[in-house]
Amino acid sequence: MITKTSETFQFDAIDDVVSDIAKGRIVIVTDDADRENEGDLVMAAEKVTPEAVNFMATHGRGLICVPISNERAEQLGLQRMVAQNREAQRTDFTVSVDAARGVTTGISAYDRATTILAIANSKSSPEDLTQPGHVFPLRAKEGGVLRRAGHTEAAVDLARMADLQPAGVLCEILHDDGTMARLPELMEFRRKHSLRICTIQSLIAYRRQREKLVTLEQVVKLPTDYGDFDLHLYRSLLDGMHHLALVKGKIDQDKPALVRVHSECLTGDVFASQRCDCGNQLHAALRQISEEGNGVLVYMRQEGRGIGLAAKIHAYKLQEEGLDTVEANAKLGLPADLRDYGLGAQILFDLGVRRFRFLTNNPKKVVGLEGYGLEMVEQVPIRVEANPHNKKYLETKKKKLGHLL
């Protein structure tokens, strides 16, 4: 199966890519244009052969590395290459290694394959490797691509999903002249060598839709100005962050619940800032849910549309100098909106919500909740009054972010 992600480029379905990984085949994994915008050859480490290493060295031309889990790195006694990682993408290199036995110089395709197999072997110990060497292990973040959207994590995730050891092999794809191959060239490379290709973004979406990423820790009663709610405390299994859900009444899977997914805004929600409409939307949603007698407000800890409190305050300063909210984020090197609604969707599902009426002015939230076993039956707008301080902000949300105001 092939999925079409743009008018020009077609990518393979993750299930098909995982199937090839399980069979010991090489695939291409690409990342986002906002990141490295590169493609890597990727395969499972325990399936590596001298021929595969030679293919990567000959046709990929990049550095051949072996992404592994942190647990595996500790088992093998692999220390980080540097104490302070200043590499742009924070790729977590360990010291380089060779196999302790069965190799000569360590650089041949045969020798490197032998070393990679030793790294992937669950029975290997630190004594089975020598340092330094000609193979470069990389430590993947716990949580894989759901924690860090990198090729390192993608390689380990794909191996795990194929029921293999959490270790991969990767190599960047370069042009003949040594420059990085970009997406058009990667598609031609894929056709020439009959390889499957996927994006890290599609792998993230695949995992988010299939894995439970939140756990319920506590439920308490919460009396408010808008009536009594049940306050549910959830913890993300990815980063330990806590999120909240205020539930009114009893959730009935057959009756669409009134739902609001609200991202934290300290300045608006707590200090009643007039620079935004967040606090007004929060209270309007609580009022509407209370009047309905049945519904959920999910409170996500995604301050500043996901960029964090400090970055938001810096963006405020740029707005005072004349930039709008989107331009200010861009000036800081940040996307206009970094929020992820996948965890919110999983919280709703865990609460028993299946069909819902969605309190939102943001179409992106609708898209963000799709694919999690939830069905939106109605989009309900939240109407709040503008003021002289947030008028430009609201106009920018409407024109540049597509909000329905």
Question: What do the PLM-derived regions correspond to, one by one?
Answer:
Residues 1-405:
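Catalytic domains of riboflavin
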